């Protein structure tokens, strides 16, 4: 019997909605990354994007344990000399709440073109509204 490998054109992708309110950031991100890769499916193939689309709501209400609200730092560089910028978790939640979840999930996905394709299937929103009603997403309880 031959080993089954999924073909990109035959993969069935579903849409899911996840509410991030009160969920721990890392535990939520690992489950999102797992589902974006498609590891929860029987037809998972490492070199094919078999994952589902995921909509994350209430990103501003995601939780972190311990003192990470003040201690966790996010860095980026402007491109100019001495242009390293840092922001705490609390500052990031105030300015760009979606980015906190996006950064956490992106770090857990493969690096390269396949990982970028998987990451594009993640839609994160700060509030409770999204514009993907036409896709009829199912509620995913994590």
Swiss-Prot record:
NCBIfam families: rplM_bact. It comes from Edwardsiella ictaluri (strain 93-146). InterPro entries: Ribosomal_uL13, Ribosomal_uL13_bac-type, Ribosomal_uL13_CS, Ribosomal_uL13_sf. GO terms for molecular function: mRNA binding; structural constituent of ribosome. The lineage of its organism: Bacteria, Pseudomonadati, Pseudomonadota, Gammaproteobacteria, Enterobacterales. This protein is one of the early assembly proteins of the 50S ribosomal subunit, although it is not seen to bind rRNA by itself. It is important during the early stages of 50S assembly. This is Large ribosomal subunit protein uL13. Part of the 50S ribosomal subunit. The gene is rplM. The keyword Iron does not apply. SUPFAM superfamilies: Ribosomal protein L13 (SSF52161). It holds the Pfam family Ribosomal_L13. GO terms for biological process: negative regulation of translation; translation. Keywords: Ribonucleoprotein, Ribosomal protein. It comes from the Bacteria. One of its GO terms (cellular component) is cytosolic large ribosomal subunit. Belongs to the universal ribosomal protein uL13 family. The keyword Ribosomal protein applies.
């Amino acid at each position: 019997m031959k080993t089954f490998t999924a073909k990109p054109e035959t993969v069935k992708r579903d849409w899911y909605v996840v509410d991030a309110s009160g969920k721990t950031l890392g535990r939520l991100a690992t489950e999102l990354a797992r589902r974006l890769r498609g590891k929860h499916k029987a037809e998972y193939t490492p070199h094919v994007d078999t994952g589902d689309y995921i909509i994350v709501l209430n990103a501003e209400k995601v939780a972190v344990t311990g003192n990470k609200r003040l201690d966790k730092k996010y860095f980026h560089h402007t491109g100019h000399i001495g242009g390293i910028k840092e922001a705490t978790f609390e500052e990031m939640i105030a300015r760009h709440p979606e980015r906190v979840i996006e950064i956490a999930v992106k770090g857990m996905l493969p690096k390269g073109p396949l990982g970028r394709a998987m990451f594009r299937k993640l839609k994160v929103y700060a509030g409770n509204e999204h514009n993907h009603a036409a896709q009829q997403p199912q509620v995913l309880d994590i």
